[in-house]
Amino acid sequence: ASDAAKRLADIGFGVVTSVQGRGTLPEDHKATLGAYNIYQPVEDFYKTCDAILVVGSRLRSNETLNYKLKLPSPHYQVDVDLDVLNRPYKPDMLVLGDSQLVMEALADKLDGRLNTDKEFIVDLQSARKKAIEYLRDGFKPYKPLVDAIQATGGADFIWVRDVTVSNSTWGNRSVLLNRPYDGVHAMGGGIGQSVQMAIGAAIAAPDRKVVCLVGDGGLQVNIGEMATAIQEGVNICVILMNSKDYEVIKNIQDNSFGGRKYFADLYTPDFEAHAESVGWSYQMFNNLSCVKSKFSSVLKSGGLKLLEVDMKAIGPYARAFGGPPVRQPKTRKKG
């Protein structure tokens, strides 16, 4: 339904997507908020909007602060499933139908008739800019890596991500996507699915670059798929963010259990030796000073590449990720 979504954006709608809906509208389009739905500047922007049209989204807890995100009202929804009326966000009006057909019909009705406030896009862009700045501040010192992926990949790569702290911190939002199928992610939350998804993407689109983001825990779950990739003769660049532990578990233990640590330290194999044993080329990054030039040369050369980022050497994220964000209840002042 990307063509219909673009028509609505061109006549005055703003667009925000779920993580799985990224690329429905090119993320450099002036009218998109990207997937920055959960950030305070975007919620503040929502307060100025007259209505919201939700198309095909389940408005998942992970992307709505556990259903506490305040959406514009009235809330109109387009879906093929009547059960949407039984979900936490109940629409004021539901249209049962195909998203492309309904949005095309809506665009036909509104084209030339929609009179949007001139400040609407200005305010939307301001909200997005503030959300991006907040997110980028949180993933220091890994900004050079994120910028290198964007700069060298351009609009011509498929971005496959495992469930890992690095993806939750920046991979889900910071690398721009321009087409509906440019992003591949395991929405269910289980680690260890990325390499096989990357193999599938590379087989489906052999002329495009496939970049895969994975953590050390996730790669150990599907490490045998590296041999499968050789057998299938595909071109994949895997970025391995190696923290040598279950980082998110430790962060949750810090947040919720007073910092006591159990069952979160992880034995990690020699990934270089494993890569060489199955025929992958390998590079280690224990600093990010030259990451842009090195990453560019890797993408140009093709083949199967494993790029290991030593997170112990580079350091932790400025803002720790301890699970999907939720809105904490306000505490009453004792009188």
Regions found by a protein language model. Give the residues of each.
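Active-site glycine- and acidic-residue-rich loops that bind
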Residues: A1, G138-Y142, G218-V221
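Glycine-rich, anion-gripping cofactor-binding loops and their flanking helix/strand elements
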Residues: A1-Y76, L176-D207, N222-I223, N255, ...
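Active-site diphosphate/adenylate-binding microenvironment
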Residues: L8, Q125-V195, A201-A202
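Short, well-ordered beta-to-alpha junction loops that form the rim of enzyme active sites
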Residues: S18, D162-S166, V309-K312
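Cofactor-binding loop segments of dinucleotide-utilizing enzymes, especially the Rossmann-like FAD-
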Residues: S18-Q20, S57, V78-V80, D98, ...
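Thiamine diphosphate
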Residues: Y46, N86-P88, L94-L96, Q100-E104, ...
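Structural motif
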Residues: A51, I158, K209-V211
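A charged, well-structured terminal subsegment
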Residues: G56-L59, D108-F120
